[in-house]
UniProtKB/Swiss-Prot annotation:
The lineage of its organism: Bacteria, Pseudomonadati, Pseudomonadota, Alphaproteobacteria, Hyphomicrobiales. It is an enzyme of class 3 (hydrolase). Pfam families: Adenine_deam_C, Amidohydro_1. One of its GO terms (molecular function) is adenine deaminase activity. PANTHER family: ADENINE DEAMINASE, N-ACETYLGLUCOSAMINE-6-PHOSPHATE DEACETYLASE. Belongs to the metallo-dependent hydrolases superfamily. Adenine deaminase family. Disulfide bonds: none annotated. It comes from the Bacteria. Its cofactor is Mn(2+). This is Adenine deaminase 1. It comes from Rhizobium etli (strain ATCC 51251 / DSM 11541 / JCM 21823 / NBRC 15573 / CFN 42). HAMAP family: Adenine_deamin. Transmembrane segments: none annotated.
Length: 565
């Protein structure tokens, strides 16, 4: 009886036909930078031959096409696609993303270990290779109320799961630097494994201390200077381009052939509408090359460099013995996937149909107390008021200060300066907390927008001009079991239900995509000026990203890591 290994060797030598042979095309050699005209032979889940003439049980003509290794998204939260892992697989794999390294941080903050188990079970069924990093900071800080708590004792049972790739983004960098005991326990347990970083603007000796904990990758760089310091200190930089956080343009200067071994690509948070309109990592690759980046540099970052950064030694090259994750492109410059292979399987609707479904969880996670307009009042204060300053395309916000108008004994919105109200309402049934503040930069002239997607604890976050509309929008989220709601003059003008932990839809991604298009139009009707108002809203409660945020406990000065007043 011939073993699988013996069969692969025979196919590579050419003694027997390969399972699949891609004929007539070329491949991009990411070692030499050459375009090599060659057949590509596939046996089972791996490449068995290149630079030769092969016979195959199935032969596919790819004349005029160029093959590259499958793309690797090195850091993302699948929940931000607003669909389940199965639908994410079906949505993104056709764009050439054959490996996704995800942090189920969002669902873990709502449901704890049940959320991690859901992702691991899903990862065993998807066609795309989904790898899971264990969420390191649940809750992210003591400055908010999460639905769950994940001490090291609850993470350790998952550490050796075949789909687990290490410890996810360690956001509590002050806790690392100051040797917080909870942080130390988690870091100590994963020494020798992969620990993902999250340290925006951290520099100098503080960065040295953070890296001394064994942290090796970083996706929060927003400038070339920041990225270069971190590369010099041994980090791999994951260049990010999501629906909100758009750092690619700022990091173009570092995407060079010399630095490409220390670079990878990631999306972090990207919704189905943007994926449908622009693409996924393929969009990043096209954009980079249009900005003057050499193809060798960006394609390395998209595959082999990413694989090496995370210890995935079996993928990232078109070469014999390597995993057959392949993308057949019309050309390198256009980066349009015409055909995708995942572990030797040609991606198709029929292949997706073979997956075992995984039942949704967390369908009753929204337990917020009802609110009314009075809950959104802000008492008049002497002097200036702290205002969250939104920066389009960034999740970093500014700490701005304004003298705001008053009506009676309450501070009101200032539409002339684009300042409206923002509130966060605890929705896990823990304490009923409710905090109010002000935000600048949404462009709203009327109405309200509310969401149960609110990083990282995913309480209800609502922005608005009218307190009655804010209350209506917040209460409606409980009725639909989570999601996004747009209210204008007492009427719901757009909504999407996200009943899986208040984060993900149970509908196909096409339905979510189309509904998001309508939601954008509803937000624009309120005056919204942001490209992605819903995900921008979702980052207002994130107290680990500078400089000013809001949680269910109040306004947070992130630089001081403390509540304001």
């Amino acid at each position: 009886m011939t073993t699988k290994l013996e069969r692969l060797i025979d196919q590579g030598v050419g003694r027997i036909p390969a399972d699949i042979v891609l004929k007539g095309g070329s491949f991009f050699d990411l070692v030499t930078g050459e375009i090599v005209r060659s057949d590509i032979a596939i046996g089972a889940d791996r490449i068995v031959g290149t630079s030769g003439d092969y016979r195959g049980e199935t032969e596919i003509d790819i004349s005029g096409r160029t093959v590259v290794p499958g793309f690797i998204d090195t850091h993302l939260h699948i929940e931000s696609s607003l669909v389940t892992p199965h639908e994410f697989d079906r949505c993104v794999l056709p764009y050439g993303v054959t490996t996704a390294i995800c942090d189920p941080h969002e669902i873990a903050n709502v449901l704890g270990t049940e959320g991690i188990e859901f992702f691991l079970e899903s990862a065993l069924e998807t066609i795309m290779d989904i790898r899971v990093q264990l969420s390191s900071c649940v809750p992210a800080t003591h400055l908010e109320t999460a639905g769950a708590d994940l001490p090291i004792e609850r993470l350790l049972p998952f550490r050796d799961h075949p789909k687990v790739i290490g410890l996810a983004e360690f956001m509590n960098f002050p806790g690392v630097i100051h040797k917080d005991s909870v942080c130390m326990a988690k870091l100590d347990a994963f020494q020798g494994g992969h620990i993902d970083g999250h340290a925006p603007l951290l520099s100098g000796n503080d960065l040295n201390g953070y890296l001394s904990a064994g942290i090796r990758t970083e996706h929060e760089c927003t400038s070339a200077a920041e990225a270069l310091e971190k590369i010099r200190k041994g980090m791999h930089i994951l260049v990010r381009e999501g629906s909100v956080s758009k750092d690619l343009a700022a990091l173009i200067p570092i995407i060079t052939e010399r630095l490409s071994p220390y670079l990878a690509l990631c999306t972090d948070d990207r919704n189905p509408l943007d994926i449908a309109e622009q693409g996924h990592l393929d969009h990043m690759i096209r954009t980079a090359m249009a900005s003057g980046v050499e193809p060798l540099a960006i394609y390395r970052a998209a595959s082999i460099s990413a694989a090496r950064a995370f210890g995935l030694r079996d993928r990232g090259l078109v070469a014999p013995g390597w995993r057959a994750d392949l993308v057949v492109l019309d050309s390198l410059q256009s980066c349009r996937a015409e055909m995708v292979f995942s572990a030797g399987r040609r991606v198709s609707d029929a292949l997706f149909a073979t997956r075992k479904p995984v039942a949704p969880i967390g369908l009753d996670s929204v337990k917020a107390r009802p609110v009314n307009a009075a809950h959104f009042g802000v008492p008049v204060a002497e002097g200036e008021t702290s205002v969250i300053g939104v920066m389009p395309g960034k999740i970093i916000t500014e700490h701005r200060r304004y003298r705001l108008p008053a009506k009676g004994n309450e501070t009101t919105v200032d539409l002339t300066n684009d300042i409206i109200k923002v509130a966060v309402i605890e929705r896990h049934g823990k304490n009923g907390n409710h905090a109010n503040g002000f935000v600048q930069g949404f462009g709203l002239k009327k109405g309200a927008i509310a969401s149960t997607v609110g990083h990282d604890s995913h309480n209800i976050c609502v922005v608005g001009v009218n307190e009655d509309d804010m209350a209506y929008a917040a209460n409606r989220l409980g009725e639909i079991k989570g999601g996004f709601v747009v209210v204008e003059d007492g009427k719901i003008t757009g909504e999407i239900a996200l009943p899986v932990a208040g984060l993900m839809s149970i509908e196909p991604y096409e339905t979510v995509r189309d509904t998001l298009h309508h939601l954008r139009q509803a937000a624009l009707a309120l005056g919204a000026t942001l490209h992605e108002p819903f995900l921008q809203l979702a980052f207002l409660p994130l107290p680990v990203i500078p400089h000013l945020k809001i949680s269910d406990r109040g306004m947070v000065d992130v630089d001081k890591f403390a509540l304001i007043g």
